[in-house]
Amino acid sequence: MKVVLIVCLVWVMAMMELVSCECWSQADCSDGHCCAGSSFSKNCRPYGGDGEQCGPRNKYEVYSTGCPYEENLMCSVINRCQSA
């Protein structure tokens, strides 16, 4: 029984790793996504759509609160995507 529980726990942890799409840099993420999060826990997240949380674009491609906005949008002063 303990072996089954351990195997299940390892499987769940492996699935969480796949779903979270952890990243170290922008190169680790697919198109339409950016690498964002704290120094210790970065994940590939989609670019912000209308009304969603965003962060301003920067030349270093380092984002903590959210990805930049999609094309034809801008990031407001309250870090929400809106029409340009």
Swiss-Prot record:
Cellular component terms (Gene Ontology): extracellular region
InterPro entries for the chain = Prokineticin_domain (IPR023569)
- Signal sequence: where? 1-21
Q: Which GO terms describe its molecular function?
A: toxin activity
Domain of life according to the entry = Eukaryota
Q: In which tissues is it expressed?
A: Expressed by the venom gland.
Indicate the segments annotated as coiled coil, or none if absent.
none
* Keyword terms of this UniProt record: Disulfide bond, Secreted, Signal, Toxin
Show the Pfam families listed in the entry. Prokineticin (PF06607)
**SS bond partners:** 23-35, 29-44, 34-67, 54-75
Name the UniProt record assigns to this protein: U8-theraphotoxin-Hhn1b
Q: Which organism is it from?
A: Cyriopagopus hainanus (Chinese bird spider)
